């Protein structure tokens, strides 16, 4: 590609000799159209005021940055979005737990908490599953349902299941070398009473349906030859 040729600037008032132009000052005044600019602004050339100078800072900024620069915290723009509940899971649906301590147990779904976890119970009196939170990824929804209209669930939220932080006691020299005995944590009486109240309302609805109590008490398991993808729950 050939290089672009530079076009030399043409002076509108070429010099006849050094310091003497071809056109006079008045001729260049008309040639450059300055008369039109003056007439447009009421017989006066437009003036552009100089920009105001910024006041000098009282203290000079440091010449060098510190070696350990403090990181600026980034703004948190995350918004809490509610977890979508599966269409097969509705209040009162009997679920099968697939993992954890109560794997294979059938439980009754009560409601979805703000964190997205499911509030379920056995009931405890039937199969030993207390009021607990379960992720919906680890349950199978069945077609069996229990009427939970008589169960009061207003007080149950994520804070209800939170653990109370305990202060660690400082050990003496003798206690440090002794084998630490694990103390059995006792369940608060309030939670025991809440479990009994929920169980009483659920068992009343369960006993109204024949063989539902036996169904909830039985543990789910796959036998040889059973294909889980072909089962209808």
Swiss-Prot record:
Pfam family, any one: Ribosomal_L6e
InterPro entries listed in its UniProt record: 60S_ribosomal_eL6, Rib_uL2_dom2, Ribosomal_eL6_KOW, Ribosomal_uL6_N, Translation_prot_SH3-like_sf
Any one GO BP annotation for this protein: translation
Keyword list, A-Z: Ribonucleoprotein, Ribosomal protein
Gene3D superfamilies assigned: 2.30.30.30
Family membership noted in the UniProt record: Belongs to the eukaryotic ribosomal protein eL6 family.
Stated name of the protein: Large ribosomal subunit protein eL6x
Protein's organism: Arabidopsis thaliana
């Amino acid at each position: 590609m050939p290089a672009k040729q530079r076009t030399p600037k043409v002076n509108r008032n070429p010099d006849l000799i050094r310091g003497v132009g071809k056109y006079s000052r008045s001729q260049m005044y008309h040639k450059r159209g300055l008369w039109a600019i003056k007439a447009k602004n009421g017989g006066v050339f437009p003036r552009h005021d100089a920009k105001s100078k910024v006041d000098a800072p009282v203290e000079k900024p440091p010449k060098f940055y510190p070696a350990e620069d403090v990181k600026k915290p980034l703004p948190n723009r995350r918004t809490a979005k509610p977890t979508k509940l599966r269409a097969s899971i509705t209040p009162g649906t009997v679920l099968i737990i697939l993992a954890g301590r109560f794997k294979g147990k059938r439980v009754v779904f009560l409601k979805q908490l703000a964190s997205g976890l499911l509030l379920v119970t056995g009931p405890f009196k039937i199969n030993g599953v207390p009021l607990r939170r379960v992720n919906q990824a680890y349950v199978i929804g069945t077609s069996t349902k229990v009427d939970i209209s008589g169960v009061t669930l207003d007080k149950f939220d994520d804070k209800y299941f939170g653990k109370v932080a305990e202060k660690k006691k400082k050990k003496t020299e003798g206690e440090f070398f002794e084998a630490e005995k694990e103390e059995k944590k006792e369940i608060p009486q309030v939670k025991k009473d809440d479990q009994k109240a929920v169980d009483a309302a659920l068992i009343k609805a369960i006993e109204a349906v024949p063989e539902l109590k036996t169904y909830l008490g039985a543990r789910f398991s796959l036998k040889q030859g059973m294909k889980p993808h072909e089962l209808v729950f």
